[in-house]
Amino acid sequence: INGMQVEFKFEDDEHDAEKSVNAYNSLKDWGMQVLAGPVTTTPTLAVAAESVNDNMFVLTPSASAQTVIETGDNVFQICFTDPNQGVASADYIAENALATKIGVIYDSSDAYSSGIYAKFKTEAETKGLEIVTAEAFTSDNKSDLSTQVAKCQEAGAELVFLPIYYTEASQI
């Protein structure tokens, strides 16, 4: 790039805080000078805390928690934040009159999911939307969400808001 030799090396953080720090340290030992990643919030927060000590430039393309860039002056994020997603989702539902009774299924053990849900809840209330039920799951019990779906149906939800990753959403 511009006459400079660039070498890329990849490590998989498996969306796990401890594994992401191990991957970061492995890349640092290899000689990394710039980190492009991690891509999700939980690993990024863990790596960002480590990178401050090293003053390593970190650029995450898609970690969306607002706290990501609060870690240090060396950490940058490209995409929109969780609060923006929650607000925009509630605004869209209200402005397009998609529903007034909303069920929510979210991952209470995940900063991304919880962050979007928290802001969605606040904005939904200001828009006159009623959250009839909010059903949580955790990373330990995310393989079957049929109970959460049934509770949304029982509560009379006209729409179910899913601030979750596609793997979990694909089960619904």
Stretches with model-predicted labels:
Residues 21, 28, 94-95, 153:
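Non-catalytic positions within long, well-ordered alpha-helices that form the structural scaffold/packing
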Residues 36, 159-163:
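Structural motif
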Residues 2-70, 78, 137-139, 143-145, ...:
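Beta-alpha junction/loop-to-helix N-cap segments that form part of ligand/metal-binding clefts
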Residues 145-153:
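Short amphipathic alpha-helix with an adjacent loop that forms part of the alpha/beta core around
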Residues 1-2, 93:
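Flexible, small-residue-rich helix->loop connector segments that border functional cores
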Residues 75-140, 159:
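An alpha-beta-alpha
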Residues 47, 120, 172:
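Aromatic/hydrophobic pocket-lining residues that form π-stacking "cages" and hydrophobic walls in ligand
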Residues 31-33, 99, 156-158:
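Short, high-confidence coil segments that cap the C-terminus of an alpha-helix
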